[in-house]
Protein backbone atom coordinates (compact mmCIF):
# COMPACT_ATOMS: atom_id res chain seq x y z
CA UNK A 1 0.00 0.00 0.00
CA UNK A 2 1.47 3.40 -0.97
CA UNK A 3 2.23 5.81 1.84
CA UNK A 4 0.15 8.97 1.58
CA UNK A 5 1.82 12.32 2.18
CA UNK A 6 0.66 14.16 5.27
CA UNK A 7 0.94 17.71 6.56
CA UNK A 8 1.81 18.68 10.13
CA UNK A 9 0.03 21.66 11.75
CA UNK A 10 3.13 23.83 11.21
CA UNK A 11 2.71 23.27 7.43
CA UNK A 12 -0.97 24.30 7.36
CA UNK A 13 -1.62 27.25 5.07
CA UNK A 14 -4.46 28.70 3.03
CA UNK A 15 -5.27 26.66 -0.08
CA UNK A 16 -3.71 23.42 1.22
CA UNK A 17 -5.78 20.35 0.23
CA UNK A 18 -6.13 17.76 3.01
CA UNK A 19 -8.32 14.78 3.95
CA UNK A 20 -10.61 15.17 6.96
CA UNK A 21 -12.93 12.33 8.02
CA UNK A 22 -12.59 10.78 4.55
CA UNK A 23 -13.48 13.98 2.70
CA UNK A 24 -11.21 16.23 0.63
CA UNK A 25 -11.03 19.71 2.17
CA UNK A 26 -9.25 22.97 1.42
CA UNK A 27 -7.83 25.08 4.25
CA UNK A 28 -9.37 28.57 4.14
CA UNK A 29 -7.84 30.02 7.31
CA UNK A 30 -5.25 28.82 9.78
CA UNK A 31 -4.57 30.57 13.08
CA UNK A 32 -1.74 29.44 15.35
CA UNK A 33 -2.69 29.99 19.01
CA UNK A 34 -0.21 29.76 21.88
CA UNK A 35 -2.07 30.24 25.15
CA UNK A 36 -0.27 31.34 28.31
CA UNK A 37 -0.85 27.89 29.79
CA UNK A 38 -1.25 24.58 28.04
CA UNK A 39 -0.35 23.31 24.62
CA UNK A 40 -0.34 25.45 21.48
CA UNK A 41 -2.99 24.67 18.86
CA UNK A 42 -4.19 25.62 15.40
CA UNK A 43 -7.70 26.94 14.82
CA UNK A 44 -8.46 25.98 11.22
CA UNK A 45 -11.35 26.85 8.91
CA UNK A 46 -11.81 24.26 6.13
CA UNK A 47 -14.15 23.94 3.15
CA UNK A 48 -15.39 20.44 2.32
CA UNK A 49 -14.68 20.25 -1.42
CA UNK A 50 -17.49 17.73 -2.03
CA UNK A 51 -20.30 19.60 -0.29
CA UNK A 52 -18.97 23.17 -0.13
CA UNK A 53 -19.72 23.29 3.63
CA UNK A 54 -17.33 25.28 5.81
CA UNK A 55 -16.22 23.79 9.13
CA UNK A 56 -13.98 24.94 11.94
CA UNK A 57 -11.65 22.50 13.66
CA UNK A 58 -8.97 22.75 16.31
CA UNK A 59 -5.77 20.71 16.02
CA UNK A 60 -3.15 20.27 18.73
CA UNK A 61 0.27 21.49 17.72
CA UNK A 62 2.07 18.59 16.02
CA UNK A 63 -1.10 16.86 14.75
CA UNK A 64 -1.12 16.00 11.07
CA UNK A 65 -3.63 15.46 8.27
CA UNK A 66 -3.32 13.29 5.19
CA UNK A 67 -2.82 15.14 1.89
CA UNK A 68 -5.82 15.01 -0.45
CA UNK A 69 -5.05 13.50 -3.85
CA UNK A 70 -6.39 16.43 -5.83
CA UNK A 71 -5.35 17.31 -9.36
CA UNK A 72 -6.14 20.56 -11.22
CA UNK A 73 -6.50 20.18 -14.99
CA UNK A 74 -7.32 22.52 -17.87
CA UNK A 75 -10.08 21.19 -20.11
CA UNK A 76 -12.23 22.48 -22.97
CA UNK A 77 -15.96 22.90 -22.31
CA UNK A 78 -18.07 20.98 -24.85
CA UNK A 79 -21.78 20.95 -23.94
CA UNK A 80 -24.47 20.47 -21.31
CA UNK A 81 -26.68 17.40 -21.84
CA UNK A 82 -29.42 18.70 -19.54
CA UNK A 83 -27.93 17.13 -16.44
CA UNK A 84 -24.15 17.13 -16.78
CA UNK A 85 -21.59 19.53 -18.23
CA UNK A 86 -19.12 17.74 -20.51
CA UNK A 87 -15.43 18.62 -20.88
CA UNK A 88 -12.55 17.27 -22.94
CA UNK A 89 -8.81 17.14 -22.33
CA UNK A 90 -7.30 18.91 -25.40
CA UNK A 91 -4.24 16.61 -25.34
CA UNK A 92 -5.61 13.12 -24.61
CA UNK A 93 -9.18 13.81 -25.86
CA UNK A 94 -10.42 12.08 -22.69
CA UNK A 95 -13.86 13.37 -21.65
CA UNK A 96 -15.32 13.91 -18.20
CA UNK A 97 -18.70 15.14 -17.00
CA UNK A 98 -19.32 17.48 -14.06
CA UNK A 99 -22.58 17.70 -12.09
CA UNK A 100 -24.42 20.83 -10.94
CA UNK A 101 -22.65 20.90 -7.55
CA UNK A 102 -19.19 20.79 -9.13
CA UNK A 103 -20.17 23.45 -11.69
CA UNK A 104 -21.45 25.97 -9.14
CA UNK A 105 -21.32 29.51 -10.59
CA UNK A 106 -19.27 28.46 -13.62
CA UNK A 107 -22.42 27.06 -15.29
CA UNK A 108 -23.89 30.49 -15.99
CA UNK A 109 -20.82 31.63 -17.96
CA UNK A 110 -20.39 28.67 -20.34
CA UNK A 111 -22.14 28.28 -23.68
CA UNK A 112 -22.26 24.99 -25.58
CA UNK A 113 -19.55 24.36 -28.21
CA UNK A 114 -17.59 27.40 -27.02
CA UNK A 115 -14.50 25.28 -26.22
CA UNK A 116 -13.77 27.67 -23.34
CA UNK A 117 -10.78 26.53 -21.28
CA UNK A 118 -11.89 25.70 -17.74
CA UNK A 119 -9.87 24.73 -14.69
CA UNK A 120 -11.25 21.54 -13.12
CA UNK A 121 -10.34 20.19 -9.68
CA UNK A 122 -10.40 16.38 -9.71
CA UNK A 123 -10.48 14.06 -6.70
CA UNK A 124 -9.97 10.38 -7.64
CA UNK A 125 -10.89 11.35 -11.21
CA UNK A 126 -14.22 12.93 -10.19
CA UNK A 127 -14.78 16.68 -10.77
CA UNK A 128 -15.20 18.52 -7.46
CA UNK A 129 -15.08 22.06 -8.72
CA UNK A 130 -15.08 23.81 -12.10
CA UNK A 131 -13.74 27.34 -12.61
CA UNK A 132 -14.87 29.22 -15.70
CA UNK A 133 -12.27 31.23 -17.62
CA UNK A 134 -11.69 34.64 -15.96
CA UNK A 135 -13.16 36.42 -18.99
CA UNK A 136 -15.87 35.34 -21.44
CA UNK A 137 -17.55 37.00 -24.43
CA UNK A 138 -21.31 36.46 -24.58
CA UNK A 139 -24.21 37.93 -26.54
CA UNK A 140 -26.96 40.00 -24.89
CA UNK A 141 -30.36 38.42 -25.59
CA UNK A 142 -32.51 40.80 -23.56
CA UNK A 143 -32.08 44.37 -22.29
CA UNK A 144 -34.14 47.55 -22.21
CA UNK A 145 -33.17 50.23 -24.70
CA UNK A 146 -31.18 52.92 -22.89
CA UNK A 147 -33.12 56.17 -22.59
CA UNK A 148 -31.04 59.23 -23.46
CA UNK A 149 -30.40 61.38 -20.41
CA UNK A 150 -31.58 58.71 -17.96
CA UNK A 151 -28.75 58.49 -15.45
CA UNK A 152 -30.85 58.10 -12.31
CA UNK A 153 -29.93 54.42 -11.95
CA UNK A 154 -26.20 55.03 -11.82
CA UNK A 155 -25.95 54.88 -15.59
CA UNK A 156 -26.46 51.12 -15.90
CA UNK A 157 -29.16 48.64 -16.79
CA UNK A 158 -29.55 44.86 -16.40
CA UNK A 159 -28.85 42.70 -19.46
CA UNK A 160 -29.61 39.00 -19.85
CA UNK A 161 -26.87 37.04 -21.62
CA UNK A 162 -27.29 34.02 -23.91
CA UNK A 163 -26.37 31.68 -21.03
CA UNK A 164 -29.07 33.14 -18.75
CA UNK A 165 -26.67 35.14 -16.58
CA UNK A 166 -27.64 38.76 -15.86
CA UNK A 167 -25.06 41.56 -15.72
CA UNK A 168 -25.27 45.35 -15.40
CA UNK A 169 -24.22 47.14 -18.57
CA UNK A 170 -23.91 50.82 -19.58
CA UNK A 171 -26.95 52.44 -21.23
CA UNK A 172 -25.34 52.52 -24.72
CA UNK A 173 -25.09 48.71 -24.89
CA UNK A 174 -27.90 47.20 -26.97
CA UNK A 175 -29.58 43.82 -27.42
CA UNK A 176 -27.57 41.49 -29.75
CA UNK A 177 -24.28 43.21 -28.73
CA UNK A 178 -21.53 40.88 -27.54
CA UNK A 179 -19.92 41.87 -24.25
CA UNK A 180 -16.81 40.82 -22.36
CA UNK A 181 -17.53 39.84 -18.73
CA UNK A 182 -15.27 39.10 -15.74
CA UNK A 183 -16.64 35.77 -14.43
CA UNK A 184 -15.05 36.25 -10.99
CA UNK A 185 -17.06 39.41 -10.26
CA UNK A 186 -19.88 39.14 -12.80
CA UNK A 187 -19.04 42.63 -14.08
CA UNK A 188 -19.31 43.99 -17.61
CA UNK A 189 -15.90 45.05 -18.95
CA UNK A 190 -16.45 46.19 -22.54
CA UNK A 191 -18.28 45.57 -25.79
CA UNK A 192 -16.60 42.82 -27.78
From Swiss-Prot:
Coiled coil: none
InterPro entries from the UniProt entry: Elong-fact-P_C, NA-bd_OB-fold, Rib_uL2_dom2, Transl_elong_fac_P/YeiP, Transl_elong_KOW-like, Transl_elong_P/YeiP_cen, Transl_elongation_fac_P, Translation_prot_SH3-like_sf
Pathway listed: Protein biosynthesis; polypeptide chain elongation
Compartment annotation: Cytoplasm
Superkingdom in the source lineage: Bacteria
Keyword Zinc: no
Gene3D superfamilies, sorted: 2.30.30.30, Nucleic acid-binding proteins (2.40.50.140)
Keywords: Cytoplasm, Elongation factor, Hydroxylation, Protein biosynthesis
Physiological role: Involved in peptide bond synthesis. Alleviates ribosome stalling that occurs when 3 or more consecutive Pro residues or the sequence PPG is present in a protein, possibly by augmenting the peptidyl transferase activity of the ribosome. Modification of Lys-37 is required for alleviation.
Identification of the protein by name: Elongation factor P
Organism annotation: Acinetobacter baylyi (strain ATCC 33305 / BD413 / ADP1)
Gene from which this protein is expressed: efp
